């Protein structure tokens, strides 16, 4: 842990005061309220500062982990080595004509609201997705029949080497909860959405309808990372879990939601180890009962806690 902190000491002179935080507890930055500490938690306020971090990390071989809103991520209890990069201070959103340009630290919910205010339709599906714009690119986020792939036109990125590059929609390689951003180590900075002119009242009515559906069906009263598993072809993960009799099953403070079986919630100070143990238990139970292998939608990052070596 201390090795990377020492290697990165020169970064303190390259970035504004307050940008770098040592041993930052990541449970403060995830929806599940779990996870160990980051060696270095860096929050750049400009594209140039982000570029400085990436170039330094590449030159000194320091690993970089991007953390968005922490809504679809499990950070392991041992934390994250090297640099954890948060772009939440890059959160500007502008609308011109039928285009909406959003920096990737903005929330996709706020992007949806800004589109509504500009009487632009196409982002209503995102009105309840609790992630950043960048996280939405990474996962090709979607809900209620809509997805990012339908409306994203271009994205400005930084490569792993710290070079700026603009990707067009033909390069996104979107699939179900996959994209070029997850396949390659691009750091997305801003995206341009091409939307359509609409009626504000109709847009708001659609957003209200989706919000009610979400609040009715999802266990929003507990910390969680949303839907844990991808939808198997022709099936629903939640239905398979429910039919396996797993609702209410607990390991430590983690529980399969009684309200929606596709969610695993933190009901009592769960650790990431407990959470992932329950995920594996659900996967094995569903496989044994139905022969279906559930694939996780949630992303797991970081390291496990090292067990002490006994004499």
Curated annotation (Swiss-Prot):
Residues 34-198 form the FAD-binding PCMH-type domain. PROSITE patterns: FAD_PCMH. One of its GO terms (biological process) is peptidoglycan biosynthetic process. The keyword NADP applies. InterPro entries: FAD-bd_PCMH, FAD-bd_PCMH-like_sf, FAD-bd_PCMH_sub1, FAD-bd_PCMH_sub2, MurB, MurB_C, MurB_C_sf, Oxid_FAD_bind_N. Pathway: Cell wall biogenesis; peptidoglycan biosynthesis. It catalyses: UDP-N-acetyl-alpha-D-muramate + NADP(+) = UDP-N-acetyl-3-O-(1-carboxyvinyl)-alpha-D-glucosamine + NADPH + H(+). Its main location: cytoplasm. GO terms for molecular function: FAD binding; UDP-N-acetylmuramate dehydrogenase activity. Transmembrane segments: none annotated. It is an enzyme of class 1 (oxidoreductase). Its EC number is 1.3.1.98. It is found in: Cytoplasm. The active site is at residues 177, 227, 297. Its cofactor is FAD. GO terms for cellular component: cytosol. The keyword Flavoprotein applies. Keywords: Cell cycle, Cell division, Cell shape, Cell wall biogenesis/degradation, Cytoplasm, FAD, Flavoprotein, NADP, Oxidoreductase, Peptidoglycan synthesis. Belongs to the MurB family. Cell wall formation. HAMAP family: MurB (MF_00037). This is UDP-N-acetylenolpyruvoylglucosamine reductase.
